[in-house]
Amino acid sequence: MVNEYKKILLLKGFELMDDYHFTSIKSLLAYDLGLTTKMQEEYNRIKITDLMEKKFQGVACLDKLIELAKDMPSLKNLVNNLRKEKSKVAKKIKTQEKAPVKKINQEEVGLAAPAPTARNKLTSEARGRIPVAQKRKTPNKEKTEAKRNKVSQEQSKPPGPSGASTSAAVDHPPLPQTSSSTPSNTSFTPNQETQAQRQVDARRNVPQNDPVTVVVLKATAPFKYESPENGKSTMFHATVASKTQYFHVKVFDINLKEKFVRKKVITISDYSECKGVMEIKEASSVSDFNQNFEVPNRIIEIANKTPKISQLYKQASGTMVYGLFMLQKKSVHKKNTIYEIQDNTGSMDVVGSGKWHNIKCEKGDKLRLFCLQLRTVDRKLKLVCGSHSFIKVIKAKKNKEGPMNVN
């Protein structure tokens, strides 16, 4: 099935831009897509579209273009048109999702026997115990009984997660955003991740069968984390780079730690990609690559570069962030701690909860962040710790990193 949002991105977006605006968009996307100067010069509209589809899957790729283009006055009409086309696709998907429901309702009227779902199984069994003649004579009674069954089932259902929202995109909807009514000291612990959010992440996890050869740039020591699916476990983060791009990596198989040594060249296969981050699990394969392999310095520079805070405010909610930031202020609350990070372009709050609540650090220290997520809290974009997040403190005076060493 054709990705409708990708189709709009290319045909109604890039193809209708002049070269100047397309070049401007490529420049703004350079960090997210890992584009070198040469890539920015050579990559055409189709290539950039393919990269955006991979990096920002589903509706997120179109949202990204709208986010960048809306600040360009001459592209106002194009942005409005993109929003209209996006709305059309969302309505189309919503209609398709409703279609099976309508069919079931028709079948319940008497066109055919409905599929044995949890809801209609009770009513169909009840009808089976009523003679046909009696069914025809007491339609009102049957409707009353069906309503009673429906209410009973709904009352027996566990309450759904409040405030959770999903997008119309079928393969990569944006992360549910925190309600604007959430207080700033709300604790975002792993246990509060709803089932709906975990299902969204599962849909985003895209298997990658093609092997990729990379050089290891850095890796953290293993650390413990807790998730609703796996309970307590151990993982580590790494950054690797191929000849054309770099990857942030989550490694869930600790036995592979010896493979992730700085400057070591390895080949990775059977991995998956979730929210733009490579994930390596027990089913993945990591092997040594014993041939000459050189990565352009430009790729390494981009991989090690920390994004500017002003640039983070332009990213979509749900974006994963890595980097080294200066701590300006620390505010400890009952359930979480707000770490205010700052650079020469602005400041942003980091919401630390769970094991990252009130860590030992002070103004002037540097925080190396791994896998924190941009989320909207109180109508303001903030960095929020998740179950796979990791924060390393680099003390200002001693100029030494915290207990976790980087290879």
Curated annotation (Swiss-Prot):
Residues 196-394 form the HIN-200 domain. One of its GO terms (cellular component) is intracellular membrane-bounded organelle. Expressed constitutively in cells of the myeloid lineage. Found in promyelocyte stage cells as well as in all other stage cells including peripheral blood monocytes and granulocytes. Also appears in myeloblast cells in some cases of acute myeloid Leukemia. It comes from the Eukaryota. One of its GO terms (biological process) is DNA damage response. A motif (Nuclear localization signal) lies at residues 131-137. InterPro entries: DAPIN, DEATH-like_dom_sf, HIN-200, HIN200/IF120x, NA-bd_OB-fold. Its N-terminal half (200 amino acids) is sufficient for maximum enhancement of YY1 DNA binding and a portion of this sequence is responsible for binding YY1. Participates in a ternary complex with YY1 and the YY1 target DNA element. Binds nucleolin and nucleophosmin/NPM/B23. This is Myeloid cell nuclear differentiation antigen. It comes from Homo sapiens (Human). The lineage of its organism: Eukaryota, Metazoa, Chordata, Craniata, Vertebrata.
